[in-house]
Swiss-Prot record:
Keywords: Cytoplasm, Endoplasmic reticulum, Glycoprotein, Heme, Iron, Lipid biosynthesis, Lipid metabolism, Lyase, Membrane, Metal-binding, Microsome, Mitochondrion, Mitochondrion inner membrane, Monooxygenase, Oxidoreductase, Steroid biosynthesis. Glycans are attached at residue 67. It catalyses: an organic molecule + reduced [NADPH--hemoprotein reductase] + O2 = an alcohol + oxidized [NADPH--hemoprotein reductase] + H2O + H(+); estrone + reduced [NADPH--hemoprotein reductase] + O2 = 2-hydroxyestrone + oxidized [NADPH--hemoprotein reductase] + H2O + H(+); estrone + reduced [NADPH--hemoprotein reductase] + O2 = 4-hydroxyestrone + oxidized [NADPH--hemoprotein reductase] + H2O + H(+); estrone + reduced [NADPH--hemoprotein reductase] + O2 = 6alpha-hydroxyestrone + oxidized [NADPH--hemoprotein reductase] + H2O + H(+). Heme binds at residue 457. This is Cytochrome P450 1A1. It comes from Macaca mulatta. It is a peripheral membrane protein. Residues 29-40 are annotated as: Mitochondrial targeting signal. It is found in: Endoplasmic reticulum membrane; Mitochondrion inner membrane; Microsome membrane; Cytoplasm. Interacts with cytosolic chaperones HSP70 and HSP90; this interaction is required for initial targeting to mitochondria. Interacts (via mitochondrial targeting signal) with TOMM40 (via N-terminus); this interaction is required for translocation across the mitochondrial outer membrane. One of its GO terms (molecular function) is hydroperoxy icosatetraenoate dehydratase activity. Pfam families: p450 (PF00067).
Length: 512
């Protein structure tokens, strides 16, 4: 009996010693906090894995709940890596806009190194002058071949011309499906239509809806968001990269295929390039490459490989977000037929049936705009921005944040914050309409989907225009529905962009 007590005491002392040692190591590894500041609060995590189990399959929901307890600035660990989590509109604006230079970095995550060989403008760790110059170049190219007018076209700009053409083709494809099987999965056709718009802008060409190479790429695109979504364990626990992982393998395959596709397109452009006859974004980048200078001030060279990376970023930015937005919009239309009828009544009143909707109609269609805003808010299909990191030691709301800290920005929390929204779980486009029938500008600016500040999505304006025009043309011509009794699954599937479950039961009829 004495021996057992002695052993128990020894074990207790040993366990206490180990606990104290671990506690001391954790405390010692924390950065020294300057006087007057404090460490961000947060729950204790498990050894080695941190808060992975707490995040679960829906990190945006778990971290939103956590923010209710710990506040808008909190800290978790994924593996052994500390991660700052920001919530609340005012806090996020403070960090990304007012303190934009402090929070404009990108963490050097493993999945990010697989995109464009680690040289992606959107995902790469660079945030210095080279990155800024490449971003300006991409913005200018995007503007020149989307918002700018085409002298040879009756459309107001290139984007309107491309979207109008693809929307008409899309309606024809859906009519074929109704004449055949009698139902369809809209995502299968929307994804090619949207891809064709960005292909026209980047490469000056479109593809048939049955083009196998393009189909292969877009069908793999869901895997991209699954891997690079905030909180992927393989980014924070290195050993997981070497275990069997179907998603990660698919992600590598997708990036290789996209890179190969872009290289082929750019090689073809080089063969037919004519100085002074710039056809698309790729041509404009080749021209800059040959001049060996990005702009007059930076004197930064743009290599052939950088052209591939810039085009890849533009293609990704202009494809997945718009496809997901339109797809979610169609889901909300069939589950809210009252809203669909109200949009169509507005279209009939403002535009009629004698001409096609144009981008210039957008300001005269407030209910359509309110529907799009509510789709963005309610679905919050981009739950987090691409993770940020701090570029230097800084502070936020009285908390000390060291240089190099990985930062998650919870956009979903903003869009469902009960402090900002009445009944946030309810889908109600009318919340954005003022008593005099206009869009509530102040409220609309509280919907955050494209990020803020220096890392804000460069294609935001074009994406909003494209979503509007696709939906306006479709809803002027057709009505969407599902058969009576069919339940539509609106549960989001977590990723960088959250998709909904596949719905094969869509039906469409031309409006009388």
């Amino acid at each position: 009996m004495l021996f057992r007590i002695s052993m128990s005491a020894t074990e207790f002392l040993l366990a206490s010693l180990i606990f104290c040692l671990v506690f001391w190591v954790i405390r010692a590894s924390r950065p020294r906090v300057p006087k007057g500041l404090k460490n961000p609060p947060g729950p204790w995590g498990w050894p080695l894995i941190g808060h992975i189990l707490t995040l679960g399959k829906n990190p945006h929901l778990a971290l939103s709940r956590m923010s209710q307890r710990y506040g808008d600035v909190l800290q978790i660990r994924i593996g052994s890596t500390p991660v700052l989590v920001l919530s609340g509109l005012d806090t996020i604006r403070q960090a990304l806009v007012q303190q934009g230079d402090d929070f404009k970095g990108r963490p050097n995550l493993y999945s990010f190194t697989l995109i464009s060989n680690g040289q992606s403008m959107s995902f790469g760790p660079d945030s210095g002058p080279v990155w800024a110059a490449r971003r300006r170049l991409a913005q200018n190219g995007l503007k020149s071949f989307s918002i700018a007018s085409d002298p040879a076209s009756s459309s107001s700009c290139y984007l309107e011309e491309h979207v109008s053409k693809e929307a008409e083709v899309l309606i024809s494809k859906l009519q074929e499906q109704m004449a055949g099987p009698g139902h369809f999965n809209p995502y299968r056709y929307v994804v090619i239509s949207v891809a064709n718009v960005i292909c026209a802008i980047c490469f000056g060409q479109r593809y048939d809806h049955n083009h196998q190479e393009l189909l292969s790429l877009v069908n793999l695109s869901n895997n991209f968001g699954e891997v690079v979504g905030s909180g992927n364990p393989a980014d924070f626990i290195p050993i997981l990269r070497y275990l069997p992982n179907r998603s990660l393998n698919g992600f590598k395959d997708l990036n290789e295929k996209f890179h190969s596709f872009m290289q082929k397109m750019i090689k073809e452009h080089y063969k037919t390039f004519e100085k002074g006859h710039i056809r698309d974004i790729t041509d404009s980048l080749i021209e800059h490459c040959q001049e060996k200078q990005l702009d007059e001030n930076a004197n930064i060279q743009l290599s052939d490989e950088k052209i591939v990376n810039v085009v890849l970023d533009l293609f990704g930015a202009g494809f997945d977000t718009v496809t997901t937005a339109i797809s979610w919009s169609l889901m909300y239309l069939v589950t809210n037929p009252r809203v669909q009828r109200k949009i169509q009544e507005e279209l009939d009143t403002v535009i009629g049936r004698s001409r096609r909707p144009r981008l210039s109609d957008r300001s005269h269609l407030p209910y359509m705009e309110a529907f799009i805003l509510e789709t963005f808010r309610h679905s919050s299909f981009v739950p987090f921005t691409i993770p940020h990191s701090t570029t230097r030691d800084t502070s936020l709301k009285g908390f000390y944040i060291p240089k190099g800290r990985c930062v998650f920005v919870n956009q979903w929390q903003i869009n469902h914050d009960q402090k900002l929204w009445v009944n946030p779980s309810e889908f109600l486009p009318e919340r954005f309409i003022t008593p005099d029938g206009a869009i509530d500008k102040v409220l609309s600016e509280k919907v955050i989907l494209f990020g803020l500040g220096k890392r804000k999505c460069i294609g935001e304006t074009i994406a909003r225009w494209e979503v509007f025009l696709f939906l306006a043309i479709l809803l002027q011509r057709v009505e969407f529905s599902v058969p009576p009794g069919v339940k539509v699954d609106m549960t989001p599937i977590y990723g960088l962009t959250m998709k909904h479950a596949c719905c094969e039961h869509f039906q469409m009829q031309l409006r009388s």
